[in-house]
């Protein structure tokens, strides 16, 4: 049975794993015949972390819609841009105009909390999801704790991942455990489009811990390999000028430096890439990377400094033999030789397989929606 679903979440042009997950979930639901409405922030939010890629997917789906607040909040006392109120007002409007049955929200704050208020006002069924940083920075630290606990308790369903199940299950009996991200392998199954030279890439935001993510070490290796390989840094953020300054003008000119890409651009980009650098240790919360999963499922090799990389992914993906190369970044020349040998002789491009398929992932979400029963919107005449 097709449903009318609104997804209130982080979305393009904001970058990041949750924004990408929002797109692929919404697209998957639309392709299953559901009417899907994404409710997103104004396109000018996000500062340095706003993507400059293609504004809309080239694929046209007649049942896929995106809504954003149409105006800025005027200056008032106390001074605030009131983005959450703008999102709440828009959410109520979308629910009323499109008879939304299910409101599916991303991060706990602000989207989950806005969804909680929308449920209280309209009676819409609320499915609550979360990221990683919001659990670590809000829930575990008890920030906005009364509102957060009320949001979790009143949700019609909660979708979490295994490591956070014990946090949510005592608060909401209808808590479901899923893998945080499943790749739509059909969308990423593009033919290899690489050139004569092998192509190395790094993708990531450059924020306050860019040095701990190993971006300088990655750049050093790419500098040492640029005569043998094409090198691309898909990087953006508050630390971009700092890292470029530390590398010097000559090194910068050797790489391509595109800004962030939209989620729908990533399959085409990865079809041209032979190996992706993933230096994520130590990251603040060390999550499984959506991008690494997309790369693996596209047949891209992974170069990492983390010996436990494959173990982190073993529950979600079957990585091919020789698809991951673990290096010691301190051994610059030996590592450059190892990368050249690995790409030239050992690694043959072959997509990895997921242990949960994207169709099964979509079916699991539909089952959660079906379990909510019928929606009876409350007092919506008030908003006409």
Region locations from a protein language model:
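Conserved donor-binding/catalytic core segment of Leloir-type glycosyltransferases
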Residues: 6, 193-213, 219-226
């Amino acid at each position: 049975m097709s449903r009318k679903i609104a997804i209130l979440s982080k979305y393009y042009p904001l970058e990041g794993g949750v924004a990408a997950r929002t797109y692929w979930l919404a697209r998957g639901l639309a392709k299953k015949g559901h009417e899907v409405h994404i409710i997103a922030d104004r396109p000018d939010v996000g500062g340095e972390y706003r993507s400059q890629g293609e504004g809309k997917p080239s694929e046209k789906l007649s049942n896929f819609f995106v809504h954003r607040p149409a105006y800025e909040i005027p200056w008032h006392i106390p001074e605030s841009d009131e983005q959450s109120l703008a999102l709440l007002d828009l959410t109520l409007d979308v629910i009323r105009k499109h008879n939304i049955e299910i409101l599916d929200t991303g991060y706990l704050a602000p989207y989950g909390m806005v969804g909680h208020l929308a449920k209280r006002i309209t009676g819409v069924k609320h499915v609550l999801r979360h990221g990683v940083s919001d659990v670590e920075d809000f829930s575990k630290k008890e920030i906005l704790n009364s509102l957060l606990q009320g949001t979790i308790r009143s949700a019609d369903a909660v979708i979490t991942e295994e490591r956070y199940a014990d946090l949510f299950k005592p608060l909401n009996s209808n808590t479901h455990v899923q893998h945080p991200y499943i790749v739509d392998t059909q969308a990423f199954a593009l033919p290899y489009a690489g050139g004569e030279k092998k192509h190395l890439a790094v993708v990531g935001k450059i924020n306050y811990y860019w040095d701990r993510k190993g971006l300088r070490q990655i750049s050093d290796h790419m500098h040492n390999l640029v005569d043998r390989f094409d090198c691309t840094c898909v990087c953006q953020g508050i630390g971009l000028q700092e890292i470029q300054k530390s590398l010097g003008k000559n090194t910068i000119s050797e790489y391509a430096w595109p800004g962030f890409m939209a989620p729908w651009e990533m399959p085409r980009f990865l079809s041209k890439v032979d190996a992706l650098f993933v230096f994520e240790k130590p990251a603040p919360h060390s999550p499984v990377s959506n991008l690494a999963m997309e790369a693996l499922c596209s047949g891209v090799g992974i170069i990492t400094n983390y010996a436990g990389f494959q173990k982190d992914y073993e529950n979600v993906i079957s990585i091919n033999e020789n698809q991951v190369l673990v290096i010691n970044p301190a051994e610059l020349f030996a590592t450059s030789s190892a990368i050249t040998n690995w790409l030239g002789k050992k690694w043959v491009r072959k997509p990895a397989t997921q242990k949960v398929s994207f169709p099964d992932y979509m079916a699991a979400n539909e089952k959660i929606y079906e379990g909510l029963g019928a929606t009876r919107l409350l007092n919506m005449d008030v908003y006409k």
